């Protein structure tokens, strides 16, 4: 009788937090097709039965109008996730903290670069990243062990 065990293990973990508090550092969200970009490198050993869990938190402020802000995550310049959010400005809900999670599955072996980008899709409206800003990637593998 064979007993097969599925073993989950951490392959790699990387994180960056360039802005830890609201207002610590701010920058305008560029109008599309330009983007603000934050990058991480993460290793993945086995191309079968693995995944990379990505988590981003971004504090934004509406400056003028209502901005449609697009957040994207790329692996090696290939988009693997996106989310769009409406950001209002003065006389409304002006500050937002967006947190989202993406799961990239069956990633090929090797080291990969993940990029988090943000861009404003609405001309005539403006928004800023005001913090906090963090981006993390956790590579998880699953092995099958026998007997």
What residue spans do the PLM features occupy?
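Terminal (often C-terminal
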Residues: 1-53, 61-66, 133-147
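Terminal beta-strand-rich extracellular "head" domains
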Residues: 57-111, 117-147
């Amino acid at each position: 009788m064979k007993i097969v065990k599925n073993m989950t293990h951490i392959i790699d973990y990387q994180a960056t937090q360039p802005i830890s508090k609201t207002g610590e550092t701010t920058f305008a969200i560029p109008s599309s097709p330009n983007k603000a970009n934050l990058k991480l490198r993460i290793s993945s050993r086995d191309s079968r039965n693995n995944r990379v869990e990505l988590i981003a938190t971004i504090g934004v402020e509406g400056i003028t109008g209502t901005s449609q802000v697009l957040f994207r995550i790329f692996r090696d310049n290939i988009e693997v996730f996106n989310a769009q959010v409406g950001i209002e400005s003065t006389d409304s809900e002006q500050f937002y903290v967006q947190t989202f999670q993406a799961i990239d599955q069956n990633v090929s072996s090797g080291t990969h670069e993940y990029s988090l980008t943000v861009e404003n899709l609405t001309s005539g409206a403006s928004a800023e990243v005001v913090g906090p800003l963090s981006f993390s990637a956790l590579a998880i593998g699953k092995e099958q062990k026998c007997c």
